[in-house]
Amino acid sequence: MIAVIALTATGVVSAVGLLICWPQVITLVLRVLFRNVIWDIRSSDRVVAITFDDGPDPTFTPQILETLRRYNIKATFFLVGERVRRFPELCEQIRDEGHCVGNHSDSWHRTVQLNNDEFESDLLRAEQSIGSCAPPKLFRPAGGLIRTAQIRLLWKHKYSVVLGSAYAFDPYRPPKKYIEWAISGGLKRGAIIVLHDSGGDRSNTVDALPVIIENAHKAGLRFEKLSECIHAR
């Protein structure tokens, strides 16, 4: 999820309110701050990518996979190494069903808070657990923020850094209707949708997913996994 940038208790409350009310505003601000990452798909085709962070989760990941099967679409799952070690069968199921996997850290410490050595060790530990991936190798920072030095380390290890362009901030567990509204408002050619399948109660995300998919189809958009849309570094 995108981290809340605040230094005081009052600032945290204000920032959370901003996330809930104006998701696209926050996204635009972060795009200015982080130019060396992938925010959307550069394509002339009417494609979008749907991604899920923080999993796998034994309750919500299977429900999401069932919905994806029902609509015959492929997604990208940014996995946490520690959770892959706990639920290896879910990682295998994600791969077996043809989805793309990416690295979302090993233990979900906020990426921006790690020093370079800690970050590199965490990255490689997660990579070992998640397993080798065909290029491109994809990384999404835990907490949604990352330092320039960390981006350089990712490039050293042949990773592309991916954030996204359509957020619902579902870690805060907004209502299902809000998730549908926030994501559908960002549905356009090249959008990268960011949702979460772990880290808390994700039932509203699961329930919103069919409407999001159907709204994308009504807009003439088709879903692709990121491995088919992003070139390897």
What are these regions (language model features)?
Residues P88, Q113-N115, A149-R152, R173-P175, ...:
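Short, well-ordered secondary-structure micro-motifs
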Residues L65-K74, F78, H99-C100, D106, ...:
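CE4/NodB-like, metal-dependent polysaccharide N-deacetylase domain
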